[in-house]
Amino acid sequence: MDKYVNGSINNIQNNNVLEYTINEINQYPEDVLEVAIKLLNIRYDPNTIKELDEHNKNNTEILGNIWLFSLNKLPLKERQLLLKYGLWELGAELPTDKLYRLEDAITSILGWSFWEIHDPKEVVLKLVKAGEMLHQQNRDIKIGEIVGEEFTALHQQNNDFTMLHQCGEEFTALHQQNNDFTMLHQLLHNIQDNSMIEDLCNKIGERANTLKKSYKNDDCKKTAKIFTILTFEGMRFDEFMNKAIEQLKIGEGTLKQHLKIYKQLEWIDIRKNPEDYDRKYIYLTYKFYEDIKDILDEYLPKKAFQEAEAKSEFMEDLKKSLKKFIEERLTPEGFEFDINEVDRLKGKERIVGAYFRSLLLNEPYEAIEMIYKVYYEKYFQFKPLEINIIGLETLRSRTIMTKAKDWGEFRNKLCVFRGDIAGIIHHRKSRPILRRYVCIDLDKNGNNKGCNCEVIRLYEPVENSQDYKIKCPECGRDIKYSESLFKDEDGEPIKLERDLTIAIIQLKETDEVYRVYLPYTPEINNLRDVEIVGILKTNHKGEYYIEGLSINPQKTINFNYDAFVRKVKNAGYSNALDYIKDRVFYEVKAILDKEGKNPTIDTLITLEILASSHIYWDKNRDGHLKPETIDCLFIGSYGQGKSLTIEPLAKLHNTTEDMIRVDMPNIENLIGLVISRDNIKFYKKGIIPMNHNRPIFIEEMMDFILRVGNDLDLLKSGKTSGIWKREREGYNIPMIGVSPWIGVGNIKDIDLMELWEIYHLKGFEEFKEAMINYFAKKLLKQHDYDRNEAEDRAKKIVNNILGANPQLNASEWLLSKILDFTLKNLRGMTDRIPLIYLLKPYTNEDWKEIKLHTYKVKRLREDNNFIKQKNLEAYECALFISYIKNKDIEFKEDALKTLWEVEEKLRDLLRDYGLFKGYSDRLFNQIEYMAKAYAKLKFKEYVDLEDVRDALKIWFKTILGVLLRIKAPDKVKEIFKLVGEEIKETQQKDEELEEINKLIEESRKLSQLKREILNYMLQNPKIYTTVEIAENFNISEDTARGILKELWKNGDVDNPESDQWRPL
């Protein structure tokens, strides 16, 4: 067949070539596809077309006829193939002034292309491309009508109105030579009812009158129709005036008066256009859309509005333009923007640039978010280069970051790393968002030789950043950093806080460990076989690290239960509980009881195995959050090891599929750690956990109530950061398991010792007055209030607290022993929390040991073998827990019967203390599940009496359990006898009671000492040092410094210089 094709070309001047070629195709139908493709290739060769054109002006028409004939002769599959690689793929590149038969080709193919091509939308996109090209060549072939008809049929068969709408609009816009369909034009396109358009314009006019109250007498409804004329691209002012006066039938004076109103509303912009001899032009602004969007919503049909919003909405169009605007100014090193550049732009880009300049100055957060989004889309969403750096033998260093000079060829390149995640570090970085550089070059006389050009750049963490220079885009001078324009309400530079996850990757077949920086990591799986796509970079020391872009798990490791049991027993353990403690909770060895145990850890592990509890949301009462149960809660002052105790739980992942999810890093700033069936979540302070699964632990006193109490109106508005918006309608916000020893919630700068002192006050009114005075002092220190205003706000806060905690009202106030009060005060929480622990305070000597231990653990983390070994073992423990959670286990008959008897006895005991049935049922379920968990941890197939006894022991280690043992020792003794366990007679000198009393006594002594120090400083006002206070009161410097810091937080003293204190 080549000879026929070549013959056609060589003899193209022969007038019979068309007839000759068609006859040959009929003679060899099996090769028609090959002939057609070759003819197509010839047809697209510019040199060939040029040569053919010299011989015969009709050559392209002849080739077009051959093309159409071959299409009609081809079978369906070949036509699809030819169409895919033919006309639509290269249509925009055709010299259309030569192809006289292109219209016929499009028309003939349209009849079947939508039904026979696999993806009709692909054809639509090609038609759009071809249509744009034809429109540019002024080839009016009424493509919109053709496409509209075909898509009407498509709509009838496939119910695909979206494609009809999109393609029809596209070609109609091209055909009408109007490429700027604004939102209002789109509205008019969808609304054909003139009365509806009239009504819409009336409402726009009413909105203008409402916004501009000083013009109440001016009826803007008369001129609102001008917005059907205006576009973003603008039009000459004189042409607009003539057109508007003609359509509105009003005088020029009235129109100009209303234009003045619209300009003050920033709905229009009138300025000179340098491209048109500085003639005045009038433009429609984006603010117009923002102000009337709710009106448009009323008139656009829902589906049409969604389509129009997705395609032509003002802000969407603006964001697309801004994205392109930003992309053009991005470099791999960062983002650069010259403020003065806007004035040099033209057309629509100038409008976008001006908007972006305004956005930078007025809404820098939004502008920076957009820059970062574009940056990551541009540089962090491309296919990884196939550079295998795993097998390089230059990786010999055993440090976290490796100096490998031979890696220079891979620096700043996208690479693929394959290995295991050997550890995770979470922290938050804060840095200024933007920096401003101004071209200022002062001579000796103080005159500026610079051009005052301003350049805004993203902050770059370079050394000596104040001296960091860039080139002026105007005059080429070196310009320095100037004070940032972008400041918050307090005048401080706006900073960008970024949650940063650092994953430690263990490369395969090597012993090397590298840092992987991930700017946003919703989920990382420990020790999964992963592929990390990242850019290899170096820091200023020449050390290599990976700026990770993505982490993709490669496979799931299967768990062998029998092998794990053998491993535990071979290691000398009779159960998995002790094995897990030693492998996972090695960091909390310092927090042990006198027997060298930590029952809290036992509880946490067993609770981790349970899957029974959850939270539900009660939406019927003002949208308030109502937890059904919280499994475990700790109570204690700062620094008592609560976070240190539970942090290792992050290593006990629940499932292999969704092992760990970290929403907020940095343990110091957390309100709690929530364990659910599928994930582990960290929550930032002040935030109510929005999790439908069960929380196990919530800790720390933060600033929630104080922050809300400062501005109750702000709470109503729902704008308070960190407050769940469904709570905004009321003040009675239930705190989920936070600080229940006062039943209040989180209060800033108050620790447990202060609160005990407040609660020792006799009588409700005295307590209330003490709380009001305390908050008033706080508000005076933290805000610019006078005394009366601070007291009024403090009263609102206290009333808010009392309203949210009915157990603190006057009728419930107890004047008996502190333990009675504690039990009564805990009732608000104990109906939902079976396990509550009171952590004892530690002495300075204890903390020295804990800090030393923590330091050793930190050093050990840097040892690769230690990281790998410990994390592998933690991972195996996680898989074991995940496995036994789903493993069913039954009670032995005697154990089940005994458990029922225990429940009956315990129910009577709880009823004496006013705990309702619902709580009792949940508690018994917990004991039952805990007994099963203990049996599973001991690799048993059935639950026996020993497991029931272990579950009871854990429960009676809690505050409520201890108090029940103190109040009713005989009944508790009877309960333990049922499971064959003897307990000592519980007297007032019970060990647990002594610890609680010791805590209370220490709290009283410290509070008394704090008052004495403050009174002494007030009576002898001067500047004191910490050493002076320590010597005067015969206490250690650490204790004195701690008390002085508390007084400083409360606003009683200030701190003029380091380690100096002055009474206020």
UniProtKB/Swiss-Prot annotation:
Keywords: Plasmid. Transmembrane segments: none annotated. InterPro entries: P-loop_NTPase, WH-like_DNA-bd_sf, WH_DNA-bd_sf. This is Uncharacterized protein MJECS08.
